[in-house]
């Protein structure tokens, strides 16, 4: 008898203080998702899965969930549908907690000292439910076909998101490291089967880049465990995902921009974003509309 998973309940809109976004991530992600600056990246439109990612990067979470649900209904055995819906949950929580403020995210001191509103338990439950659903479907697919690259990719994505939740939301660094290690492992397995599954490079790239920011003794210890701590390699893999990836290409481009800001190369970081903005003339009006839809989304989820 196949396993069944309850449909996650709609997260309530928590009463949280208004905050100013110094550099709205929704604006940046709109630029990144629609940009032609990376010529190999196909536009995120045309299928419910593509449309879901485009809506999510636009912070239209209600639309993202709807698109991903359409995909899951049409493809009930595909682990990527539920993994993608989990991404919409974690992006929602990121937005509510201010994690998606690019200038805040690029500054460790400001990020760690920021005020942290309570986590919405409905969002956590929805996220965990979709993670469990995706991992179950991936395990079934691997049992059926040990060379199923998509299944390993799904496990890389779910492990990576759990690392993000542990680090950026729960602040459990050891748990984040364990999940990051799993994400890198599964990504390498997916790439060994399908080298052109460029999105899978993101997990390995982020592991190398983020762990390289630790102090030298910590990098040495992590290196002994097999963790990737090579910053240059991390940047290379992020660029590869940004140029050749699909669903995760916008996120890889964002990480590259954050990297420039973190390294003090403000002008280079801005240059990346300015170059991207030139291919998106509709961005100003679209970003304003997105902010309105995000507020409406939160009220509907009460």
Where in the sequence are the language-model features?
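Solenoid-like repeat scaffolds
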Residues: 71-75, 224-228, 242-245, 275-281
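Boundary at the C-terminal end of the N-terminal hydrophobic targeting segment
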Residues: 37-43
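Bacterial N-terminal signal peptides
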Residues: 24-36
